[in-house]
């Protein structure tokens, strides 16, 4: 089985990083293929912005992220970092999200990952 572990903690040597290391050791020992996606180490940009879509056909004075995501997904023209993350999701049979709870929620980098990678019109729709 292909396992993707998405780590959202700024310190790789943290308790969360240790949990990832333990999971990798266990999963690899059981014969699985594991890839760790360390959002901080890879400097994933969690902020959705118009600059991610420089070839937009939308009106330049208004940025509507969901429409941009859908249009660029359909044109296979999403930003490179999002395409990389989507390829990882396609590869994975199992995805594990490892993160601390800060103020009763996930870290902002992971929230931004959800916002940018779970592309409207591609990974989900409102229907």
Locations of regions flagged by a protein language model:
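N-terminal beta1-alpha1-beta2 submodule of the flavodoxin-like/Rossmannoid cofactor-binding fold
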Residues: 1-99, 103-123
């Amino acid at each position: 089985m292909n396992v993707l572990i998405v780590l959202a903690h700024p310190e790789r040597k943290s308790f969360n990083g240790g949990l990832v290391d333990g999971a990798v050791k266990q999963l690899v020992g059981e014969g699985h293929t594991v890839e760790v996606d360390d959002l901080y180490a890879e400097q994933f940009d969690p902020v959705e912005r118009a600059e991610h879509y420089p070839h937009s056909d939308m009106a330049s004075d208004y940025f509507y992220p969901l429409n941009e995501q859908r249009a660029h997904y359909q044109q296979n023209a999403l930003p490179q970092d999002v395409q990389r993350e989507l390829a990882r999701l396609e590869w994975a049979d199992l995805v594990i999200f490892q993160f601390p709870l800060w103020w009763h929620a996930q870290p902002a980098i992971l929230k931004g990952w959800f916002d940018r990678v779970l592309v409207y019109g591609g990974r989900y729709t409102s229907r």
